[in-house]
């Protein structure tokens, strides 16, 4: 197990993550305390954030040719 030092950064306490523990491509972390542990994990989008995503094309659910045949299937 590795250890890191805690230092003061203004009014906050901080640590430096070792390079091999970097969250590559992540700009925001969620921090949670569980007992005597502190867990860092990437912030996940909320369901509400889907409203801001680009909408699907109008023909997204249009009739399309079946690409999988029913051959070999049986009725339940």
Curated annotation (Swiss-Prot):
Q: Which GO terms describe its molecular function?
A: DNA binding
Q: Where is the SpoVT-AbrB domain?
A: 4-45
SMART domains attached to this UniProt entry: SpoVT_AbrB
Which keywords does this Swiss-Prot/TrEMBL entry list?
DNA-binding, Plasmid, Virulence
The record, for Pfam families, names: MazE_antitoxin
| NAD is among the record's keywords | no
Stated name of the protein: Virulence-associated protein VagC
Q: Which gene encodes it?
A: vagC
